[in-house]
Amino acid sequence: MKKILLILLLLFLIPLSACGKVKYEFKDGVMYEDGKEATGTFEVTINGFKSKGKFINGLANEIEVYYSDGSIMRKDIYVNGEFLGLQVYYRNGKLMSTYLKDKRMDIFYDDGQLLMRFDKEKGENTVYFENGNPLLVIVGTTTSTLYNENKEVLSRIENGIRLDDDITFKNLEDGSFEIIKNNKVIGKISAYGVPTYFYSTGETLMKLDNSVYKTLFKNGNTFFERDGNITRFYYKDGKLLYESKGKEWTIYNREGEKIITAFDEITDIKKID
């Protein structure tokens, strides 16, 4: 009789244990629990970083991503499950980037100074010097203006035509030209027609290097570069900060880790509440 009771008990326990494991899945922006839209607080791994998010009926309500020391790296903003934007932070707590869906994206230096703003509504992209002055302003696909750190215009192009009436050129013996404005050399054009522009103090600001347009920090390291549809921004020490290729883009921390991409990888899902 005891053996029969033991067998019956095992028969009940086996299906219970088999049913005890819940399957969680994040697919197409929706969190599922055993195939149904989930509600609760979840711990997940996003692009390799520990994260926590709240979901209601499968849709995200808020998501936070953390550095290894527990400090906040990123906050995703949602309203009624719709993704509206995000904020990314440096380890020191300063804002690194903000993104408002279909409106604007900003990237900041680690001291809080604005580095780049892409205004989708205006169709305007502006890159800034560390002192806050504009370095390059691009409007649509037709107009671009390059400045030095003192906000003096070095070059203005509209519809492929230079609009620099106050600029003169001095022919040098090697076939190159000095670009002169207000009796000061602001740049140079090589004998092959390749332009280079200078800071007000003489260091190279912008140059064309093997068909890649590069803007440099005063220390000579690349600040940002553009090669066709590929754009890259760098930290002052030369490490990659931001990269975009068409609709794909990635932001990196100083350790070279991808901390945010256009397509997040979410794994290790665990419900905690």
Language-model features: locations:
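Glycine/tyrosine- and acidic-biased, solvent-exposed loop/turn segments at the edges of beta-strands
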Residues: 17-273
